[in-house]
Amino acid sequence: MGLLSVDLLITLQILPWFFSNCLFLALYDSVVLLKHVILLLSCSKSSRGEWRRMLTSEGLRTVWNSFLLDAYKQVKLGGDAPNSKVVRVTSGCCRRRSFSGKGESECHLLDFASSNRPLVVNFGSATUPPFISQLPTFRKLVEEFSDVADFLLVYIDEAHPADGWAAPGVATKSFEVKKHRSQEERCVAAHKLLEHFSLPPQCQVVADCMDNNTNVAYGVSFERVCIVQRQKIAYLGGKGPFFYNLKEVRHWLEQTYRKRUVPTCELIM
């Protein structure tokens, strides 16, 4: 099968999912607009905020590119884990250091994997609402399973930058992040996220390089989670935001290590 035929086949596979996402964005905009109109008619002060449409040309390009990233990703369940280049994010150093893409700050994703423990890798950014909403759950996973597994958070390109396809759900000043124009800006954003959510020290934090090589290799786009074991992909989560599921990660860890959380009531008894 020729390259053109493969590209055509992938496009045909993507189209139904792409159009379903467009429909979701159109319905979302309709509901938000209706709510905005009702608030205006009721003279509510909360209606004075800016209404941001999600179904825009930039939004459509972003969604389409996310499906292309997923379709052409290098990572496959049971296959070799891509050893992508990343940059360490350490406390207090991001603002002072100059990131040229070289030097001791740069490392590889599999540097954080050990031979006898699984590595849970969580990809996302501060401007992705589903990723942010699940960070407390991820933090709990780290706290409960750090005795049997290693954890790594990879900060990628912003999903909804303030100067791009901005989302209404990230209007707070804490997460108004613009498009990264340098490695330093990306690391600073990752460091702010690390501080805001007080991630446990057992979870290492790195940032994708500016060529987005990790994002491309793992087909992340918005958010994704996977588990690396013996340099193979033991678990591969679905494409975010709709198939990003940390419950499956918990289930995998529990099934693999027969570990169950003891209910609080039993501890009291």
UniProtKB/Swiss-Prot annotation:
One of its GO terms (molecular function) is thyroxine 5'-deiodinase activity. Residues 1-7 are lumenal. It is a single-pass type III membrane protein. It comes from the Eukaryota. Residues 29-269 are cytoplasmic. InterPro entries: Iodothyronine_deiodinase, Iodothyronine_deiodinase_AS, Thioredoxin-like_sf. It is found in: Endoplasmic reticulum membrane. The keyword Hydrolase does not apply. It catalyses: 3,3',5-triiodo-L-thyronine + iodide + A + H(+) = L-thyroxine + AH2; 3,3'-diiodo-L-thyronine + iodide + A + H(+) = 3,3',5'-triiodo-L-thyronine + AH2; 3'-iodo-L-thyronine + iodide + A + H(+) = 3',5'-diiodo-L-thyronine + AH2; 3,3'-diiodothyronamine + iodide + A + H(+) = 3,3',5'-triiodothyronamine + AH2. Keywords: Endoplasmic reticulum, Membrane, Oxidoreductase, Selenocysteine, Thyroid hormones biosynthesis, Transmembrane, Transmembrane helix. Its EC number is 1.21.99.4. Predominantly monomer. Can form homodimers but homodimerization is not essential for enzyme activity. Belongs to the iodothyronine deiodinase family. This is Type II iodothyronine deiodinase. It comes from Neoceratodus forsteri (Australian lungfish). The lineage of its organism: Eukaryota, Metazoa, Chordata, Craniata, Vertebrata.
